[in-house]
UniProtKB/Swiss-Prot annotation:
Gene3D superfamilies, per the entry: HesB-like domain
UniProt xrefs under SUPFAM superfamilies: HesB-like domain (SSF89360)
Family: Belongs to the HesB/IscA family.
Taxonomic path: Bacteria, Pseudomonadati, Aquificota, Aquificia, Aquificales
One GO BP: iron-sulfur cluster assembly
Organism listed in the record: Aquifex aeolicus (strain VF5)
Name of the protein this chain belongs to: Protein aq_1857
Any one Gene Ontology cellular component term annotated for this protein: cytoplasm
Alphabetical list of InterPro entries matching this protein: FeS_biogenesis, FeS_cluster_insertion, FeS_cluster_insertion_CS, HesB-like_dom_sf
Amino acid sequence: MQEQAQQFIFKVTDKAVEEIKKVAQENNIENPILRIRVVPGGCSGFQYAMGFDDTVEEGDHVFEYDGVKVVIDPFSMPYVNGAELDYVVDFMGGGFTIRNPNATGSCGCGSSFSCG
């Protein structure tokens, strides 16, 4: 019996794509590749790290939205599978947020999460 490959999903809202393009343009980045990683740290065990990258590494999961590539490494992908990157503006300003259905808890500051 052949094993079926797992289908990974990571969504990026139109607002987030717009903001990624804006930040890339401000930094003279022509073909933006946004890398999202899950790293150990914070009060709850894991936290997100995001930044522009120059390359897509072997094994990376690549999601493309309107010319913006979002790449996630193989370690991080199971932790963010089904999650959504958004850009929200509130009275404190604007920022990226990840809505993650895999997160079973988060700390009070909102910068780290746990998975169970």
